[in-house]
């Protein structure tokens, strides 16, 4: 079965072909136009998707060495996401499905991220037939979920203010780094001292209110941003420049330690032996290393996507559509546009 996946929920225009569960192409066009604005401009994102969608889809089909008529299913992100961006991809998918007389499978963007750790480029690979704890962490979402064998899930924690990826980007902006700042902080942190300065870790065992949040898996990163802002304001610019790598490493340590602590704690509480980490922040080398060490120390299996599948991509859309179709948990030919659909209602 050949599935074409289309992803346009934010600022990546992506198309992918998955053949019998195996990725045979994955084209991603990132919109650099937003860099000068320090963040994604929704209207510009929609226009860029309109400009790029045809060429990106054609490239994905060509790289898979098939023709459009060889496609069996069209899958596209149907939300959550920027309404205009989602509509570009989903409307294009609707039109293509109609012209080719193929079924359309709308895919929840967050669900696709959850299972991106199981994307494969070879045969005989499938998500584990066991429950696992999912940490989904990106610029727009930070949440913990218990995922069952039948693909159903329960959200047990989420950010109460800023997402982890947003914390990376906004603290990076305070430090004068280019957008998106997350990857820049990651590179700087590699040569810095994570213990240089201890920034706050809210709702954890290190916070003053730890007793109140011992069994709470929510996240909070607004206090970290405020702390970084005050810290920078007290320092001479030359001091910040000299210690930029150390400050970046300290920020990364504060964010990733919270993510790891809560994820492992959730696995212990729910007596689950596997953890999946997904979303754009899962590409962060500090998080990957820290989570791997914690999982090994606690006897937990870790599933984490290749960096190319961590950020928004269509391979995860097509792969999740294939998984749902093969498990009989979805019905194609649904054409609803739901750019603001909640995560839970899509399960």
Swiss-Prot record:
GO CC annotations? cytoplasm
Q: Record-annotated residues binding Fe cation?
A: 109, 113, 312
Q: Which residues bind substrate?
A: 136-140, 169, 182, 186, 284
Chief location bin: cytoplasm
Give a short account of what the protein does: Required for the formation of a threonylcarbamoyl group on adenosine at position 37 (t(6)A37) in tRNAs that read codons beginning with adenine. Is involved in the transfer of the threonylcarbamoyl moiety of threonylcarbamoyl-AMP (TC-AMP) to the N6 group of A37, together with TsaE and TsaB. TsaD likely plays a direct catalytic role in this reaction.
Cited PANTHER family: TRNA N6-ADENOSINE THREONYLCARBAMOYLTRANSFERASE, TRNA N6-ADENOSINE THREONYLCARBAMOYLTRANSFERASE, MITOCHONDRIAL
Q: Name it.
A: tRNA N6-adenosine threonylcarbamoyltransferase
């Amino acid at each position: 079965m050949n599935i074409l996946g289309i992803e346009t929920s934010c600022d990546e225009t992506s198309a992918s072909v998955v053949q019998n569960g195996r990725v045979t192409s994955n084209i991603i066009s990132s919109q650099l136009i937003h860099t000068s604005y320090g963040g994604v401009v929704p209207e510009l994102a929609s226009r860029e998707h309109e400009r790029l969608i045809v060429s990106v889809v054609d490239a994905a089909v060509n790289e898979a060495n098939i023709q459009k008529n060889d496609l069996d299913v069209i899958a596209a992100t149907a939300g959550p996401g920027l309404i205009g961006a989602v509509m570009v991809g989903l409307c294009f998918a609707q039109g293509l499905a109609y012209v080719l007389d193929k079924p359309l499978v709308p895919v929840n963007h967050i669900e696709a991220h959850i299972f991106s750790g199981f994307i494969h480029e070879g045969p005989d690979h499938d998500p584990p037939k066991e429950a696992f704890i999912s940490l989904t962490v990106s610029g727009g979402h930070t949440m913990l979920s218990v995922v069952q064998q039948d693909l159903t899930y329960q959200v047990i924690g989420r950010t109460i203010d800023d997402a982890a990826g947003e914390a990376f980007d906004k603290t990076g902006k305070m430090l004068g780094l280019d957008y998106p700042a997350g990857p820049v902080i990651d590179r700087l942190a590699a040569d810095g001292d994570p213990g240089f300065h201890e920034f706050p870790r809210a709702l954890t065992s290190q916070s003053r209110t730890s007793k109140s949040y011992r069994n709470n898996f929510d996240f909070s990163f607004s206090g970290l941003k405020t702390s970084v802002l005050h810290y920078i304001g007290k320092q001479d610019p030359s001091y910040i420049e000299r210690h930029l790598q150390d400050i970046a490493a300290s920020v990364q340590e504060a964010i990733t330690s919270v993510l790891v602590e809560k994820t492992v704690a959730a696995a212990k509480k729910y007596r689950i032996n596997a953890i999946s980490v997904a979303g754009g922040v899962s590409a962060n080398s500090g998080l990957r290393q820290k989570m791997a060490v914690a999982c090994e120390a606690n006897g937990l299996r870790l599933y984490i996507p290749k960096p190319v599948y961590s950020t928004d991509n269509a391979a995860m859309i097509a792969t999740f559509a294939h998984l749902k179709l093969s498990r009989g948990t979805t019905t194609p030919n649904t054409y609803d546009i739901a750019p603001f659909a909640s995560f839970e209602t899509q399960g």
